[in-house]
């Protein structure tokens, strides 16, 4: 609200000083494209003022807006929708050893997957008629544990740069080509868009969403930003061929879609390795576009910042103008935005602590547009455990000056 008032006063002053002869309505609309959908509270006005200030309405072009994909631009997770389709259509290749699918796979995870799914390179997993195999894969994807509760992943990793079960999904498709994975994603997209809102399906013993929807408000926001001269990117911790299939639906091409990029073998097939960032080369999931990794890929791929510097917050002119996300995975790059930090409230503690603290007056909080969550009853534990530390611990959320963010009540739902 503080920033909205400031922008409103500035806009009023500009109007008072404007010459009497105004451009035609059509010319004004082309220069100053407007949002056309409804938002919570004053959010539409807040976003519009950022668009006007950074875009063609003020004579500017080239500002960057970046959005997470899953549960930010769409309701529900498109990587999960693709995995669901693959499990029901026997599309996953059978690995020679489950241990080889992840650098962090435990003996317990290997045993559980081997018992439920089998091994032996070549052919496909018969997941459509092996519910125990499907169960193990879905449980590991969702929780990082086997159906018996044993840890599926163990070892050391930077918890602000990766999470093994996110990196594992592209690794499950090792042996397939990007074109094959794209075709699975396209089939899953058709199926998920046709399913009614609220629909679920059963995978093994798991109940999962059966539908996905593009948010009308986000589609309109992206289109308006593009018309106003912004360069709009998607930055996702999903698999890049999957995300590209969906991002085309909001007018964002592959060149502006950043996600986990699997390295291909000499025959053009996906491997268990992925491209790196920030001075870290090809790796087996050590760094992906996840929390601080999203900042790294934005700095590297959009602003051309190479080496370890890509992990660092950049000066004002080398940061995005608008950032949008829904989860702790997005908190770093959304915080970096200079104009608006757009958050869809999914009750994710670290992100919501930053949003409700609103240290710079530029945070824009919106309930999910479809099936929004109810109000969180307890305050977010910002002063104690909301920050996701690199070693996997949970510590207080700190402001740039080192002060602790106090616990925050959930007020936008």
Regions found by a protein language model. Name each.
Residues 3-11, 18-21, 25-69, 77, ...:
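Non-catalytic pre-domain segments flanking phosphatase-related domains
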Residues 17-21, 367-370:
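Short, intrinsically disordered, charge-biased short linear motifs at domain edges
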Residues 29-45, 56-57, 62, 159, ...:
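C-terminal cap/substrate-recognition subdomain and adjoining C-terminal extension
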Residues 29-37, 68-70, 154, 165-171, ...:
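Charged, low-complexity surface segments at secondary-structure and domain boundaries
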Residues 79, 86, 94-208:
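A metal-dependent, Asp-based hydrolase signature
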Residues 82-83, 102, 241, 248:
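Generic secondary-structure boundary signal with a strong preference for alpha-helix termini
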């Amino acid at each position: 609200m503080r920033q909205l008032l400031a922008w409103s006063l500035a806009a009023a002053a500009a109007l008072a000083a404007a010459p009497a002869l105004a451009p035609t309505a059509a010319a004004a609309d082309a220069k100053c494209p407007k949002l056309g959908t409804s938002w919570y509270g004053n959010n539409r006005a807040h976003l519009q003022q950022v668009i006007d200030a950074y875009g063609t309405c003020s004579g500017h072009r080239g500002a960057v807006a970046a959005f997470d994909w899953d549960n930010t631009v769409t309701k529900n997770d498109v990587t999960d929708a693709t995995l669901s389709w693959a499990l029901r259509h026997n599309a996953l290749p059978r690995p020679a050893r489950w241990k080889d699918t992840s650098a962090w796979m435990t003996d317990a995870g290997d045993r559980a997957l081997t018992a439920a799914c089998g091994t032996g390179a070549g052919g496909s997993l018969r997941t459509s008629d092996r519910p125990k195999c499907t169960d193990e894969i879905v449980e590991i994807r969702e929780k990082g544990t086997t159906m018996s509760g044993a840890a599926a992943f163990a070892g050391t990793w930077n918890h602000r740069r990766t999470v093994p079960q996110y990196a594992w999904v592209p690794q499950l498709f090792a042996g397939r080509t990007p074109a094959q994975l794209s075709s699975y994603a396209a089939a899953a997209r058709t199926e998920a868009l046709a399913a009614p809102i609220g629909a679920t399906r059963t995978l093994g013993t798991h109940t999962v969403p059966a539908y996905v929807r593009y948010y009308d408000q986000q589609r309109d926001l992206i289109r308006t930003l593009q018309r106003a001269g912004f360069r709009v990117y998607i930055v996702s911790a999903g698999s890049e061929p999957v995300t590209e299939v969906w991002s085309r639906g909001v007018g964002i091409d592959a060149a502006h879609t950043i996600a986990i990029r699997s390295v291909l073998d000499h025959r053009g097939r996906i491997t268990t390795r992925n491209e790196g960032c920030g001075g870290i080369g090809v790796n087996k999931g050590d760094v992906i576009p996840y929390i601080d990794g999203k900042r790294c890929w934005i700095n590297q791929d959009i602003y051309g910042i190479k080496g370890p510097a890509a992990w660092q917050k950049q000066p004002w002119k080398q940061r995005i103008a608008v950032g949008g996300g829904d989860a702790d995975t997005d908190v770093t790059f959304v915080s970096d935005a200079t104009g608006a930090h757009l958050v869809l409230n999914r009750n994710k503690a670290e992100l919501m602590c930053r949003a409700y603290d609103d240290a710079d007056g530029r945070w824009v909080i919106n309930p999910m547009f479809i099936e929004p969550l109810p109000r969180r009853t307890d305050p977010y534990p910002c002063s104690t455990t909301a920050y996701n530390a690199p070693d996997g611990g949970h510590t207080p959320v700190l402001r740039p000056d080192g002060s602790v963010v106090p616990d925050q009540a959930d007020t936008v739902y």
